[in-house]
Amino acid sequence: MSDARFGMTIPFDDVPLHEQADWVRELADLGYTDVWSSEANGADAFTPLALASVWAPSLRLGTAIVPAFTRGPACLAQSVGSLAQAAPGRLAFGIGTSSNVIVEGWNGIPFEQPYER
C-alpha cells in the first residue's frame, strides 16, 4: 500500500459552489486523497472545504493558506475549530502572511512586519 497522497485545489473556477458536489465526489472516486483551498479569488478558504467534508467524507481537507492578517485571532480560531469538528482528523490548517496585494490592496490592512504578526 502506498502512502502517496494526491490533491486538488478547490473550488473549481467558473463553477458555482452549489454545483461542485459531483465534481468533488468524483475526485475521491478517481483516487484523490486531499482537497485544498486558499483565499486568493472567489470563495473564502473554509466554505469549499466544509462542503467537501460532506460531499466526500474520505478526502483530507487543507487550507493553503489562510492569511493571518485578514481575520482576528478569535474569528480564525472559530473557523478552524468549526471545520475541525465537522471533519474530525481530516484538516490540515495552513496559515501564512499572504501578500501585500491581498492584505493591503484587497482588505485595506497595512502589510507591515508580516513575520512578526
Describe the role of every protein-language-model region.
Residues 1-61, 69:
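N-terminal beta1-alpha1-beta2 module of alpha/beta enzyme domains
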Residues 2-15, 70-117:
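Flexible, glycine-rich active-site loops centered on histidine and acidic residues
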Residues 55, 61, 65, 99-107:
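Glycine-rich, flexible loop/turn motifs
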Residues 38, 64, 94-96:
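Structural motif
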